[in-house]
Design a protein with these regions (language model features):
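Gly/Gly-Pro- and Ser/Thr-rich, intrinsically disordered tail segments characteristic of DNA damage-repair
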Residues: 1-115, 236, 292-311
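Alpha-helical structural motif
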Residues: 3-6, 10, 19, 122-125, ...
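Basic, nucleic-acid-binding surfaces and adjacent catalytic neighborhoods in DNA/RNA-processing proteins
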Residues: 22-37, 47, 59, 85, ...
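Phosphate/anion-contacting hairpin/loop surfaces
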Residues: 62-63, 67-168, 172-181, 191
């Protein structure tokens, strides 16, 4: 499933094509909205909250509406220029069609979530979400409060819960646990939650905003080396050489996503009941992301407190 940084980047690409343009024809191909006519409305904003996209429009009579969509596992958006059409093989997957006054058309394909709400009532759609590190109204203290409210919950499951902190998906949760040097099954109450939240914000913003850094956590964009643990089951840990492990289910996660971790670099509870490792409090991952326009490598501190060089 696309994560918050993915949806943020998608919205950024869609804005030049849609914002400020009038809809000359619109189709919302879901039963509940089949009769809603948005023709004549002007697209005013495209914003995101976590993995949710909010496309705001104002109709000719001044009514402000928001098209709320979510990609989940199947959805995508594409824009074709004037005089061009979407390939016919894809037309059956169209859930949203927005024809613009310059002749371009935006298509939302295979979108599992399509709804329209009054803009003043957007909270009906996204009000349950936690703070989003990519939004201007980001509230770190509130994210910390929500996570800390369930001290016994495994950290990976807590981070995946969009009600705590919006935008983190499986890739970033796995990488954050590695970067903080903690087992994905460590209870939230045993961790430095403010430091975890600060790192999550820094990583998401770096990935979303820095050219060439999208979802690269190691600073190395080569295939198989862009992530510390995600997708690297059975391969040697890039830090210590221990084989990376994977399990199919995150405790408490209904979507049964995979969890990757290095047993040596991420001490603490394991996925098996009762299994534990060395206490995680002896390590911290805190090297800042590079400010330049390239991927940055985050590396851990050793138990002596000296930074290990990236390798």
């Amino acid at each position: 499933m696309p994560e918050g940084d993915s949806v943020y980047r998608l919205a950024r690409r869609l804005r030049p094509a849609l914002v400020g343009h009038r809809l000359v024809h619109a189709e919302l191909r879901v039963p509940a909205l089949a009769t809603l006519d948005l023709a004549g409305a002007t697209v005013t904003e495209i914003v995101t909250h976590g993995k949710h996209q909010l496309t705001r429009v104002v109709r000719g009579d001044g009514e402000a509406l928001t098209l709320h969509t979510h990609l989940k596992m199947t959805g995508s958006w594409t824009v074709v220029g004037a005089g061009k059409r979407l390939p016919s093989r894809l037309m059956d997957t169209v859930r949203v069609l927005l024809e613009l006054d310059d002749g371009a058309t935006a298509y939302g394909l295979d979108l599992p979530v399509v709804e329209v709400v009054p803009t003043a009532q957007e909270d009906d759609a996204v009000g349950h979400l936690g703070p989003d590190p990519l939004r201007a109204d980001w509230d770190a203290a509130e994210a910390v409060r929500r996570l800390a409210a369930q001290p016994d919950r495994p950290v990976a499951a807590a981070l995946l819960d969009q009600r705590n902190l919006a935008g983190l998906g499986n890739l970033w949760v796995n990488e954050l646990c590695f970067l903080r040097g903690t087992s994905p099954w460590s209870p939230v109450g045993e961790l430095d939650v403010p430091a975890l939240v600060a790192l999550a914000r820094r990583c998401l913003r770096h990935s979303a905003l820095v050219e060439g850094a999208y979802q690269v956590t190691t600073g190395d964009r080569r295939d198989g080396r862009s992530h510390w643990v995600s997708g690297r089951a059975g391969q040697a840990c890039l830090r210590c050489g221990t084989p990376v492990r994977v399990v199919e289910e995150v405790p408490g996660d209904a979507e049964r996503r995979r969890t990757w971790w290095c047993p040596h670099c991420q001490p603490g509870p394991g996925p098996e009941p009762g299994r534990t490792g060395p206490a995680p409090a002896t390590q911290a991952w805190d090297r800042p992301l590079a400010a330049g326009g390239r991927a940055a490598r985050l590396t851990p501190r050793s138990r002596t407190g000296r930074s290990r060089p990236g390798r």
